[in-house]
Protein backbone atom coordinates (compact mmCIF):
# COMPACT_ATOMS: atom_id res chain seq x y z
CA UNK A 1 0.00 0.00 0.00
CA UNK A 2 2.77 2.40 0.98
CA UNK A 3 4.67 1.38 -2.11
CA UNK A 4 1.65 2.12 -4.37
CA UNK A 5 1.16 5.58 -2.87
CA UNK A 6 4.83 6.41 -3.42
CA UNK A 7 4.61 5.33 -7.08
CA UNK A 8 1.58 7.52 -7.58
CA UNK A 9 3.32 10.51 -6.01
CA UNK A 10 6.37 9.94 -8.21
CA UNK A 11 4.25 10.00 -11.38
CA UNK A 12 2.34 13.20 -10.50
CA UNK A 13 5.13 15.72 -11.28
CA UNK A 14 5.58 14.20 -14.71
CA UNK A 15 1.91 14.68 -15.54
CA UNK A 16 1.94 18.21 -14.13
CA UNK A 17 5.01 19.13 -16.15
CA UNK A 18 3.35 18.02 -19.40
CA UNK A 19 0.28 20.12 -18.64
CA UNK A 20 2.47 23.16 -17.89
CA UNK A 21 4.16 22.96 -21.30
CA UNK A 22 0.78 22.96 -23.01
CA UNK A 23 -0.37 25.92 -20.93
CA UNK A 24 2.76 27.94 -21.80
CA UNK A 25 2.22 27.54 -25.54
CA UNK A 26 1.00 30.87 -27.01
CA UNK A 27 -2.53 30.27 -28.36
CA UNK A 28 -2.34 33.42 -30.47
CA UNK A 29 0.78 32.35 -32.33
CA UNK A 30 -0.24 31.29 -35.84
CA UNK A 31 0.68 27.87 -37.06
CA UNK A 32 3.13 27.75 -40.00
CA UNK A 33 0.25 26.80 -42.30
CA UNK A 34 -1.69 29.95 -41.27
CA UNK A 35 1.31 32.17 -42.01
CA UNK A 36 1.53 30.65 -45.47
CA UNK A 37 -2.14 31.45 -46.17
CA UNK A 38 -1.73 35.14 -45.28
CA UNK A 39 0.93 35.74 -47.91
CA UNK A 40 -0.52 37.08 -51.20
CA UNK A 41 -0.36 34.54 -53.97
CA UNK A 42 2.04 34.99 -56.86
CA UNK A 43 -0.97 35.41 -59.17
CA UNK A 44 -2.40 38.22 -57.01
CA UNK A 45 0.97 39.99 -56.83
CA UNK A 46 1.30 39.78 -60.61
CA UNK A 47 -2.24 41.16 -61.06
CA UNK A 48 -1.56 44.09 -58.70
CA UNK A 49 1.68 44.90 -60.52
CA UNK A 50 -0.11 44.82 -63.88
CA UNK A 51 -2.86 47.19 -62.64
CA UNK A 52 -0.27 49.56 -61.19
CA UNK A 53 1.69 49.60 -64.45
CA UNK A 54 -1.48 50.25 -66.46
CA UNK A 55 -2.46 53.20 -64.23
CA UNK A 56 1.05 54.66 -64.42
CA UNK A 57 1.03 54.37 -68.22
CA UNK A 58 -2.33 56.19 -68.44
CA UNK A 59 -1.11 58.98 -66.19
CA UNK A 60 2.10 59.28 -68.19
CA UNK A 61 0.21 59.49 -71.51
CA UNK A 62 -2.26 62.11 -70.28
CA UNK A 63 0.39 64.16 -68.47
CA UNK A 64 2.58 64.34 -71.59
CA UNK A 65 -0.37 65.47 -73.70
CA UNK A 66 -1.42 68.11 -71.16
CA UNK A 67 2.16 69.41 -70.88
CA UNK A 68 2.30 69.70 -74.67
CA UNK A 69 -0.96 71.65 -74.77
CA UNK A 70 0.20 73.90 -71.94
CA UNK A 71 3.32 74.82 -73.91
CA UNK A 72 1.22 75.56 -77.01
CA UNK A 73 -1.42 77.66 -75.26
CA UNK A 74 1.29 79.62 -73.42
CA UNK A 75 3.06 80.49 -76.68
CA UNK A 76 -0.07 81.00 -78.79
CA UNK A 77 -3.23 81.51 -76.68
CA UNK A 78 -6.63 81.78 -78.37
CA UNK A 79 -7.94 85.36 -78.74
CA UNK A 80 -9.35 86.77 -75.48
CA UNK A 81 -8.42 83.57 -73.59
CA UNK A 82 -5.76 82.30 -71.22
CA UNK A 83 -5.37 79.03 -69.33
CA UNK A 84 -2.92 77.14 -67.15
CA UNK A 85 -2.55 74.98 -64.03
CA UNK A 86 -3.88 76.36 -60.75
CA UNK A 87 -0.81 75.13 -58.87
CA UNK A 88 1.41 72.08 -59.05
CA UNK A 89 -1.37 69.78 -60.27
CA UNK A 90 -1.16 69.55 -64.06
CA UNK A 91 -4.69 68.08 -64.16
CA UNK A 92 -6.39 71.13 -62.59
CA UNK A 93 -6.45 74.35 -64.66
CA UNK A 94 -7.99 77.79 -64.38
CA UNK A 95 -9.00 79.69 -67.52
CA UNK A 96 -9.97 83.29 -68.19
CA UNK A 97 -12.20 84.38 -71.07
CA UNK A 98 -12.86 88.02 -71.92
CA UNK A 99 -16.38 88.72 -73.13
CA UNK A 100 -16.24 88.83 -76.95
CA UNK A 101 -16.35 92.36 -78.43
CA UNK A 102 -19.80 93.25 -79.75
CA UNK A 103 -21.54 90.61 -77.62
CA UNK A 104 -23.75 91.17 -74.57
CA UNK A 105 -20.81 89.88 -72.51
CA UNK A 106 -18.34 92.51 -73.73
CA UNK A 107 -16.34 94.03 -70.88
CA UNK A 108 -16.76 90.97 -68.67
CA UNK A 109 -14.00 88.73 -67.35
CA UNK A 110 -15.17 85.15 -66.93
CA UNK A 111 -13.28 82.52 -64.96
CA UNK A 112 -13.57 78.81 -65.71
CA UNK A 113 -12.33 75.60 -64.09
CA UNK A 114 -10.82 72.89 -66.28
CA UNK A 115 -10.28 69.36 -64.97
CA UNK A 116 -8.48 66.69 -66.98
CA UNK A 117 -8.85 62.99 -66.17
CA UNK A 118 -6.18 60.30 -66.49
CA UNK A 119 -8.05 59.18 -69.66
CA UNK A 120 -7.37 62.49 -71.45
CA UNK A 121 -7.29 62.98 -74.45
CA UNK A 122 -9.53 59.97 -75.01
CA UNK A 123 -12.17 61.53 -72.77
CA UNK A 124 -13.06 65.25 -72.76
CA UNK A 125 -11.97 67.62 -70.01
CA UNK A 126 -14.57 68.90 -67.57
CA UNK A 127 -15.03 72.64 -68.11
CA UNK A 128 -17.30 74.79 -65.93
CA UNK A 129 -17.88 78.53 -65.46
CA UNK A 130 -16.97 79.90 -62.03
CA UNK A 131 -18.35 83.33 -62.94
CA UNK A 132 -22.13 83.65 -63.16
CA UNK A 133 -23.41 84.30 -66.65
CA UNK A 134 -26.85 84.79 -68.21
CA UNK A 135 -26.78 82.28 -71.06
CA UNK A 136 -29.21 79.63 -72.28
CA UNK A 137 -26.41 77.07 -72.74
CA UNK A 138 -24.76 77.61 -69.34
CA UNK A 139 -26.65 76.88 -66.12
CA UNK A 140 -26.32 78.29 -62.61
CA UNK A 141 -23.77 75.61 -61.66
CA UNK A 142 -21.54 76.69 -64.54
CA UNK A 143 -22.19 73.55 -66.59
CA UNK A 144 -21.79 74.16 -70.33
CA UNK A 145 -23.97 72.55 -72.97
CA UNK A 146 -21.41 72.10 -75.75
CA UNK A 147 -21.35 69.06 -78.02
CA UNK A 148 -17.54 68.73 -78.12
CA UNK A 149 -17.49 68.40 -74.34
CA UNK A 150 -19.86 65.44 -74.64
CA UNK A 151 -20.59 63.04 -77.50
CA UNK A 152 -18.68 64.93 -80.19
CA UNK A 153 -15.37 64.93 -78.33
CA UNK A 154 -12.34 63.70 -80.28
CA UNK A 155 -8.74 63.10 -79.12
CA UNK A 156 -7.71 65.41 -81.97
CA UNK A 157 -9.31 68.35 -80.13
CA UNK A 158 -7.31 70.49 -77.71
CA UNK A 159 -8.16 72.78 -74.82
CA UNK A 160 -7.41 75.77 -77.10
CA UNK A 161 -10.12 74.60 -79.50
CA UNK A 162 -12.50 74.07 -76.60
CA UNK A 163 -11.96 77.65 -75.40
CA UNK A 164 -12.51 78.97 -78.94
CA UNK A 165 -15.80 77.04 -79.11
CA UNK A 166 -16.90 78.53 -75.79
CA UNK A 167 -16.09 82.03 -77.08
CA UNK A 168 -18.20 81.31 -80.17
CA UNK A 169 -21.03 80.19 -77.88
CA UNK A 170 -20.84 83.53 -76.07
CA UNK A 171 -21.13 85.35 -79.38
CA UNK A 172 -23.90 83.14 -80.77
CA UNK A 173 -25.84 81.04 -78.28
CA UNK A 174 -27.69 77.88 -79.32
CA UNK A 175 -31.33 78.16 -78.19
CA UNK A 176 -32.17 74.96 -80.10
CA UNK A 177 -30.18 72.93 -77.55
CA UNK A 178 -30.62 74.88 -74.30
CA UNK A 179 -29.55 74.02 -70.79
CA UNK A 180 -31.79 76.77 -69.37
CA UNK A 181 -35.09 76.63 -71.25
CA UNK A 182 -36.52 79.89 -69.90
CA UNK A 183 -33.54 81.91 -71.13
CA UNK A 184 -33.71 80.22 -74.53
CA UNK A 185 -37.40 81.07 -74.83
CA UNK A 186 -36.72 84.68 -73.85
CA UNK A 187 -33.88 84.86 -76.39
CA UNK A 188 -36.29 83.75 -79.14
CA UNK A 189 -39.35 85.76 -78.11
CA UNK A 190 -37.98 88.88 -76.41
CA UNK A 191 -34.42 89.43 -77.55
CA UNK A 192 -34.19 93.00 -76.23
CA UNK A 193 -35.07 91.93 -72.68
CA UNK A 194 -32.70 88.97 -72.90
CA UNK A 195 -29.82 91.20 -73.96
CA UNK A 196 -30.60 93.75 -71.26
CA UNK A 197 -30.45 91.14 -68.50
CA UNK A 198 -27.33 89.52 -69.97
CA UNK A 199 -25.50 92.87 -69.94
CA UNK A 200 -26.75 93.55 -66.42
CA UNK A 201 -25.39 90.20 -65.18
CA UNK A 202 -22.09 90.80 -66.95
CA UNK A 203 -21.70 94.14 -65.20
CA UNK A 204 -22.73 92.70 -61.82
CA UNK A 205 -20.80 89.43 -61.78
CA UNK A 206 -18.00 89.70 -64.35
CA UNK A 207 -16.51 93.16 -63.86
From Swiss-Prot:
Q: What is its EC number?
A: 2.3.2.23
UniProt GO cellular component terms: cytosol; nucleoplasm; nucleus
Which molecular function GO terms apply here?
ATP binding; ubiquitin conjugating enzyme activity; ubiquitin-protein transferase activity
Does Signal appear among the keywords?
no
Where is the segment annotated Disordered?
1-63
Keywords assigned by UniProt, alphabetized: Acetylation, ATP-binding, Cytoplasm, Growth regulation, Nucleotide-binding, Nucleus, Phosphoprotein, Transferase, Ubl conjugation pathway
- Using the record, list the residue span of the signal peptide; answer none if the entry has no such feature: none
Coiled-coil parts of chain: none
Q: Where is the composition biased (Low complexity)?
A: 50-63
Residues covered by the UBC core domain:
61-207
The chemistry this enzyme catalyses reads: S-ubiquitinyl-[E1 ubiquitin-activating enzyme]-L-cysteine + [E2 ubiquitin-conjugating enzyme]-L-cysteine = [E1 ubiquitin-activating enzyme]-L-cysteine + S-ubiquitinyl-[E2 ubiquitin-conjugating enzyme]-L-cysteine
Q: Which InterPro entries match?
A: UBQ-conjugat_E2_core, UBQ-conjugating_AS, UBQ-conjugating_enzyme/RWD
Return the Basic and acidic residues bias intervals: 1-10
Is Acetylation among this UniProt entry's keywords? yes
Question: Residue positions of the PTM N-acetylserine?
Answer: 2
Q: Where is the active site?
A: 145
Q: Which SUPFAM superfamilies match?
A: UBC-like
One Pfam family name from the record?
A: UQ_con
Metabolic or biological pathway, per its Swiss-Prot or TrEMBL entry? Protein modification; protein ubiquitination
Q: Subunit structure of this entry?
A: The ubiquitin-loaded form interacts specifically with importin-11 (IPO11), leading to its import into the nucleus. Interacts with NEDD4L.
Q: Could you tell me what this protein does?
A: Accepts ubiquitin from the E1 complex and catalyzes its covalent attachment to other proteins. In vitro catalyzes 'Lys-11'- and 'Lys-48'-, as well as 'Lys-63'-linked polyubiquitination. Participates in the regulation of transepithelial sodium transport in renal cells.
- Name of the protein this chain belongs to: Ubiquitin-conjugating enzyme E2 E3
Question: Top-down, what is the taxonomic lineage of the species of origin?
Answer: Eukaryota, Metazoa, Chordata, Craniata, Vertebrata
Amino acid sequence: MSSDRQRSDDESPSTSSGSSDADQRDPAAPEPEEQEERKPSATQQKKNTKLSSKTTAKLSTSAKRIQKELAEITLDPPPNCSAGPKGDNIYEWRSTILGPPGSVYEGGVFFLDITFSSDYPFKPPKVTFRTRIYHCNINSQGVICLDILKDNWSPALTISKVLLSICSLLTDCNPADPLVGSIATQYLTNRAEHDRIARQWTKRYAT
